[in-house]
Amino acid sequence: MPLPLPNLDDRRWEDLVEEGRALIPLYGPDWTDHNLHDPGITIMELLAWVTEMDIYWLNRVPDAHRRKFLAMAGVTPRPPQPAWTVLHLRLKAGATAQHLPAGVHFEAARSEAASPSTVPFRTLAPLAAIPGEVQTLQLKQGDRFTDLTARLLRGEALALWGDDPQPGAELYIGLSDPPPVETPVTLYAVLEGEHATWAARARLIEEAARRAGLCRPQFGCADEPGEEPPVDVPLPPHHSVALSWEYLSAGGRWHPLAVTDDTRAFTLSGSIVLTLPAAPGMSRAVIGAAPEPAYYLRCRLRRGSYDAAPVLRHLLLNGVAAEQAAAAGVTIWLIAPGANLPADPPQPGTDDTLNFSLDASGAIADLRREPNAPALRVLAFEPPDGGPGRLALAVETLGEGDGRPHQQIAGAWPQVAGESLRVFTREGDAWRVWEQRPDFDAAGRADAHFVLDARTGEITFGDGERGRTVPPGVPILAAYDSTLASGGALKPNRVFHLPDSPTNRALLAEVAAIAASLEIVTNPVPASGGAEAETVDQAAGRALAELQKPTRAVTAADYEALAFETPGVTLARVGVRPNLHPGFPCWDAPGVVTVIILPHLPAGRPEPSCETIRQVAAYLARRRIVGTRIEVVGPTYRTVAVQASVRACQGERPAALRERLIARLDAFFDPLIGGPEGGGWPFGRDVYRSEVLQLLDETPGVEHVISLELLGDDCEPGCGNVCIGPVELVD
C-alpha cells in the first residue's frame, strides 16, 4: 500500500492574510488602519496570493523528480515498442529460390484512411524462400496415423504430439514441391500459450546469460577490474526433449537432416531451418492417412518428456518473423571525380566504418575506413565514372547546430523504436558520436550528451556547463529506426508487397524480379505488441507491480511464485513445505524448504522429469536466503481405492451409474482438477470418508449409499480416513 502524500503546508489565502495582519502591530506599530481600503492591505493580499501559489507547487512532485525516484527503483519509462508479426511468403509456380537477408522491408496498405498510407515491416532473420507449401501434416502414435492437415489449414489450435506426448511419436510434414538441395528450408511454427511467446524466449536467454556470467573466468589484474563485456549466449535447448529430423528418399529410406531448431523442440514460436544434402534426393510418396503423394519430412520424438503438450496454430513454409520498424532517413554525398577511394569499396547492405573529407563544393574528396568511425548502413555506393559518384548512408540529416544552450531538434519520424537512436555531428573531417542520457545531471562541459523525449522525438543538447553545445553550422545526423508503435497493429491475413525502397535496393540485387516471383505475402497472425512511449504515470504503475513481485525466496508464497516463473518450465501446481525434508517427512528439518512441483504431463499421473527438477532447483538456488537448503521434488502417489455399495434410483441402469461414479471419483482425486475446490488434490491432504460419502450421495442416479470403505496401500478396507504424506498425492 503506498504511503499517503503529506500536505506540507495547508494554509490558504485567507490564512496568510490574517497571519500577516496579526503581525502588523509587531513590525509596524504606527500602522493603525488595517481595513481593506488601505493600500498596504492590498499589497499584503497580493503577496498572499503569490505565496499560496508557491505552497501549491510545494506539495507537488515534478516529473523530473519522479523519473529520478523511478530510476532509484530500477525503472525507466519504456520507449515506443514496435508491433510484431509473422510473414508467410508464397512463390509462384516455377519460380526459383529467392534468398532474402534479414532486414528486408515489406509493406501493407492501411484499410482506413490514415497517414502514412502503408505500414512497413522488416524481417528479423534471413530467409531462403522456395516454391511450394505444407501440403499435409500427420501424427503417428504407435501404428496409428492421425491426419491434422484440415485443422492446420483452418488455423485451429491442435496438440502437435497429441494430448500426452510419448517418445516414439512421429510427425510427418508433406511438402508440395521438392526443396532445393543445399539450400536452407525454413518452417515457421506458431505455438500458443504464454510460455511460447517472445517474452518467454527473452527470459530464457536472460537466465542463460546470468548463469554463463557466473561461470566466466576472470581475466585481468585485480586492481584494474574494468567493465566486463556482456555475455552473448544462444537460446538454450530444451532441458528434456530431443527431436530427430529426417527426409524420405527413393526406396522409402529415411536420412538424417542438419537442423537449426529455434523453437526449442516446439515449445517456442520460431523457425526450424533444415538443409538437404546433395544426395540422395527426396522422393515423393503416399504415407499414412493422406491420400495425395508429397515430399515428406519426418520429426521423431526421440527421448524426454514435455511439461505440457505443445499446441500448434500455424506451420508455415517460408515463414519469417517481422517487426514494424524501418530505418529512417537517407543522406547522400556526391563523390568528386578523382577522389581517393578505399581499395575494398563499400558494399551496399552492410555496415561500414567510413569517414571522408569534403572539398570546397561539398563533394567527397577522400573516402577511407577508420576504426573509430561509427558503423553505418551503406545503402548505395557508385564510384565516379566520368562524373560525380554517390555514397548513400542510412542516416538522417536533422539540421545544423546553432551554438545555443539546450538546442532542440527532431527527426522526420517522432517515434523512435526501442533504443535504436544514435546521434552524430560532422565537425570538420571527423565524426563526433553523442551519447544518450536520461538527463544532464552528471554531464560535464566536454561531455557529448543528449536527451531524447521519447513521446515527441525531440533531441535536446547540453547548455555548455552540463553537456556540450553543438557548434554553429555543424551538421547534426541521426541513425534510428522509426515505428508507428500501436499504430502498427494489423489484423491477420493482410496482403503485403515488396517495395522498391532504398533499403531493399541495398539488400537485394533485383527487387523487381523478386517481387515478380512472389505470388502472395500475408501475415497469418495479427501484428500486435506495439505500444506508445510510456508516460511517467504508466512507468510508476509498472514499478509498483514489479516491486510486488518476489525476487528473493523468503516466504512460502515467494517460493511458489518463483518456481512458476522458472524460464523454460511449464508447471501446473507448486507446493511449499517449510522445515520439511522429503526423505524424513516425520521429523522437523529447520532451514530446509521442500518445493513440490507438478507439471501438466503425463496425463492422469503427472510428475516432473529429472531435468525439470534440476531447472527449477537451479533457478531457486540463486534466489534463496543464505543458510536455507532447498529440496525440489515431484509428488509421490499413494493409491487409494473406494469400495462402496449404493442404491440406484428407479429406472437407473446399474452399468451407467457405475461408470458415472467412477468418473466422479477419478475427477475428485485428480491431481490437476480434483480436490474440494477443483484446483487439484492438495499436497499432503488426507482422504476423508465423509467427503467421499457426500460425493457418492450427490451423484445423479444415486438414491443413497449403503456402505463405504476406503483402502490404502495396505489394501485393508477400513471405515476411517486415509492418511496422506506431506509430499503425496492420491492416485
Predicted features along the sequence, with ranges:
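Signature of Asx- and small-polar-rich beta-strand/turn repeats characteristic
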Residues: 1-731
